[in-house]
Each structure stands twice: as C-alpha cells, then as structure tokens.
C-alpha cells in the first residue's frame, strides 16, 4: 500500500502538464509540453519560431476548430498526446 501513494502523487504532478503534438501539412510533427492552464499562444509562438514562420502565415486547429491565442488546453478539453493541426494561411484571390 505504501507503494501506491507515491504513484498517485506523481500522477497528480504530471496532471498539471500535457504533451501536445503539432502536425504540419508537410507531415512534420513537433511535440510540446505545456501546462493545462497556459494560453496556447505560448505553444503557437514557439512552433512558429522553430519552423521559421510568423503567426500570420499559419492557422492552428484542434478537432477542426480554430484555436485562439487565449485558449488553454483545459478550455478546449485537450488530453495528453492530442494533436493540433497547422495549416498555411491561404492568400491570393483571382487575377483581374
């Protein structure tokens, strides 16, 4: 029984953080560890820096829904190992 209590303590500690995958359109996957109540803007900016992109060039989606910079993993009910999809911002239109 004494062995069970430390395991529960470890679980509670890890519960504050969540591992998220960010999948690019090119098939690349970058993993991040973030606190459940930290705004996702931190992850989004880190991803952009790592990929040499700006926030204006790409869009982040989770379960098909756009992610706002102020959203947190807890608000979006994200679970450990969930994947965020990244899409290049569509630019252009038609030629006149």
From Swiss-Prot:
There is a cross-link at residue 93 (Glycyl lysine isopeptide (Gly-Lys) (interchain with K-? in acceptor proteins)). Polymeric chains can be formed through Lys-11 cross-linking. Cleavage of precursor form by a sentrin-specific protease is necessary for function. Keywords: Isopeptide bond, Nucleus, Ubl conjugation, Ubl conjugation pathway. Transmembrane segments: none annotated. GO terms for molecular function: protein tag activity; ubiquitin-like protein ligase binding. It comes from the Eukaryota. Belongs to the ubiquitin family. SUMO subfamily. This is Small ubiquitin-related modifier 2.
């Amino acid at each position: 029984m004494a062995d069970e209590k430390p395991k529960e303590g470890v679980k509670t500690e890890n519960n504050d953080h969540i591992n998220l995958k960010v999948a690019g359109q090119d098939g690349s996957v970058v993993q991040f560890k973030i606190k459940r109540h930290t705004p996702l803007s931190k992850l989004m900016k880190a991803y952009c820096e790592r990929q040499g992109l700006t926030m204006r060039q790409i869009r982040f989606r989770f379960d098909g829904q756009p992610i706002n910079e102020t959203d947190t993993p807890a608000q979006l009910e994200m679970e450990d190992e969930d994947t965020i999809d990244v899409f290049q911002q569509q630019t252009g239109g038609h030629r006149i």
